[in-house]
Amino acid sequence: PNALGILNSALSNGFMAFADKLVPKHPEFVAIATGNTYGSGATMEYVGRNPIDGATIDRFVQLEIPIDEKVEEAMLASVGLEQVVATKWLTAVRKARTNVAESGLKVIVSPRATLNGAKLLRSGSFSMSEVFTATVTKGAKPDQVTKIGAGVTL
């Protein structure tokens, strides 16, 4: 839980203290970190288990890295879902993701929803509507579910 505190100290001081010695930061050292946001980039609205304190946030430059749709498509293809079903599922997830962004909802619709949903659909045990509820709108409040699902064809 105190990993960020240790990292913050190392970034600030330029060295790491170990039991036997101090190790200085390498001249070419670069730290790259990610944070779990609500899927809308560097908004400072993090959903991780431990809040990130201001001093640590201040040590980093924040860049928005959008979901790589080609990677998402490759993840989906790896499941081996029938192409017609895969296309319909991906379209539904992406429409939901757009709805979340446009509505400003604090809901995450990540590529994990695409992958997990495809696996459930491949099993043949669930309808697309059930899978959408289980992977895309899970945990959302009823009014959010309506906004997330607006215009989604299942």
Predicted regions and their residues:
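C-terminal regulatory/interaction module of P-loop NTP-utilizing enzymes
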Residues: P1-L154
